[in-house]
Curated annotation (Swiss-Prot):
Presence of keyword Hydrolase: yes
One Gene Ontology molecular-function label: sugar-phosphatase activity
Catalytic activity annotation: alpha-D-glucose 1-phosphate + H2O = D-glucose + phosphate
Keyword field: Hydrolase, Periplasm, Signal
UniProt protein name: Glucose-1-phosphatase
Organism of origin: Escherichia coli (strain K12)
Active site location: 40 (nucleophile), 312 (proton donor)
CDD domains registered for this protein in UniProt: HP_HAP_like
Free-text activity regulation comment from the record: Independent from inorganic phosphate availability, and apparently submitted to catabolite repression, it is positively controlled by cAMP and the cAMP receptor protein.
Functional description taken from the UniProt entry: Absolutely required for the growth of E.coli in a high-phosphate medium containing G-1-P as the sole carbon source.
A GO BP annotation: glucose catabolic process
């Protein structure tokens, strides 16, 4: 990682921090506990020899400054900015004191044991609590999935496997992807790709998707949906990383509308694999159990601030497992953006002597990511209020804590 660049980022946001605007909160409401479930920040795509990317186009892929799958230097900068912004917000709500390190054990950071997730958590802590001794907890063996964040099938019955595959096929059947495949074939020159010339796989539109739900493995798919996801993911990461536009998809994406059409493949891949209720409830169970413990069963002794860092599959399956209502993120084509956080907030209403839950998706817009915009309360991250089907919200986005508890209690059964 480029430490000079990171240090400059930390210094830069301190200069922008003055005159921060207050966020409107109902009178008498006090924030008491926060849990953030974050996706890792910007990583390099996997474009090694023989990969889906290399097989899908005759074109040469641009070089990245880190190995495939690892957090980039810019990803670190972006996460420092997000950490700084969240610190400002927490200070505004009285959860931390400006210019001071939080007392021991009040902040707990826990990441999946891959480089991109652990590094994301480290950079978030650097931005939020610079100079403070707050460790990032993770499994000792790096490069392996932590069971809490590992979205694998945990039912070994043949009946469940069949049910899960049928559920994934049903999710895919809801999608209209022909236009997306046709545009993608044109962008990558698929007819001249190694996949076409060597394997006679020359059409994404006509290709067949085959789903799998094997015990102790992630839900999977082979076929055009996987190819499409890999390609659009790579283009999206190029855009965020700040590659010149003539290098992003070789200059072939000319409009926002084309980005929207292509993003249907990436979102559709995630929706098909991880958002059917049957699959989501199974693969998200360890994460749901962890969140239930922190926010419900052990909340009186839990850290005031918990930061969890995992993957888009964790967030997608969690949102379905808890039965969130459909949501729309503005200024973003990704359903679960890079570096985005589901922020669970437990509030106390002193006037009515009751506890409330508010849940927001806090994320950086596509332009904030590409431009590496520093974030403050004056130049904030994007925030979208989410709603659980089992916990209806009021006009300010709050729902009763007892109803939230019931949702979690049901989800961990």
């Amino acid at each position: 990682m480029n430490k000079t660049l990171i240090a400059a980022a930390v210094a830069g946001i301190v200069l922008l921090a003055s005159n921060a605007q207050a966020q409107t909160v109902p009178e008498g409401y006090q924030l008491q506990q926060v849990l953030m479930m974050s996706r890792h920040n910007l990583r390099a795509p996997l474009a090694n020899n023989g990969s889906v990317l290399e097989q899908s186009t005759p074109n040469k892929w641009p070089e990245w400054d880190v190995p495939g799958g690892q957090l980039t230097t810019k990803g670190g900068v972006l996460e420092v900015y997000m950490g700084h912004y969240m610190r400002e917000w927490l200070a505004e709500q009285g959860m931390v004191k400006s210019g001071e390190c939080p007392p021991p054990y009040t902040v707990y950071a826990y990441a999946n044991s891959l480089q991109r997730t652990v590094a994301t958590a480290q950079f978030f802590i650097t931005g939020a609590f610079p100079g403070c001794d707050i460790p990032v907890h993770h499994q000792e063996k790096m490069g392996t999935m932590d069971p809490t964040f590992n979205p694998v099938i945990t039912d070994d019955s043949a009946a469940f496997s069949e049910q899960a595959v049928a559920a994934m096929e049903k999710e895919l059947s809801k999608l209209q992807l022909t236009d997306s495949y046709q545009l993608l074939e044109k962008i990558v020159n698929y007819k001249d790709s190694p996949a076409c010339k060597e394997k006679q796989q020359c059409s994404l539109v006509d290709g067949k998707n085959t789903f799998s739900a094997k015990y102790q493995q992630e839900p999977g798919v082979s076929g055009p949906l996987k190819v499409g996801n890999s390609l659009v993911d790579a283009f999206t990461l190029q855009y965020y990383e700040g590659f010149p536009m003539d290098q992003v998809a070789w200059g072939e994406i000319k409009s926002d509308q084309q980005w929207k059409v292509l993003s249907k493949l990436k979102n559709g891949y995630q929706d098909s694999l991880f958002t059917s209720p049957e699959v989501a409830r199974n693969v998200a169970k360890p994460l749901v159990s962890y969140i239930d413990k922190a926010l419900v069963t052990d909340r009186t002794s839990a850290p005031k601030i918990t930061v969890l860092v995992g993957h888009d599959s964790n967030i997608a399956s969690l949102l379905t497992a808890l039965d969130f209502k459909p949501y729309q993120l503005h200024d973003q084509n990704e359903r679960t953006p890079i570096g985005g956080k589901i922020v669970f907030q437990r509030w106390h209403d002193s006037k009515a002597n009751r506890d409330l839950m508010k849940i927001e998706y806090v994320y950086q817009s596509a332009e904030q990511l590409r431009n590496a915009d520093a974030l403050t309360l004056q130049a904030p991250a994007q925030r979208v209020t989410l709603e659980l089907s089992g916990c209806p919200i009021d006009a300010d986005g709050f729902c009763p804590m007892d109803k939230f508890d019931s949702v979690l209690n049901e989800a961990v059964k």
